[in-house]
Amino acid sequence: VSRRLARETPNAIYVNQYDNLANREAHYRMTGPEILKQMPEIDVFVAGIGTGGTICGVGKYLKENKPSCRVVAVDPVGSIVYDYFKYGKLKTAPKTYKIEGIGEDFIPKNYDLSVIDDMIQV
């Protein structure tokens, strides 16, 4: 819908937060440093994996600046991301899930799963 509205609406833009790497970069440059400043003894960072921007951007920053910090993603049952993370391939077709904002039926360009230590299904 948002792509169509951007095409049809004068002066509108489509941000494409799933594949726009500025999403991940913003969290790397801003959110990650803020978290580490506020919690210098952080042991684990847990976040949902939707667009990938938050967890992958913050995760990269934390791995570079506090390598002992674990990064754990949360993904709903029914999303394809858990299988892709655990097995390196898509094992199941996406199913319906009732959690809004996380979980996907495709792998966005913002995903850098190398910064994620573990993933939990909810």
Segments and roles (model prediction):
Residues 1, 19-120:
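Glycine-rich phosphate/pyrophosphate-binding loop at beta-loop-alpha junctions
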Residues 1-9:
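PLP-dependent aminotransferase-class I/II
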Residues 10-12, 69:
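A structural micro-motif
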Residues 14-18:
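Short beta-strands and strand-loop turn motifs
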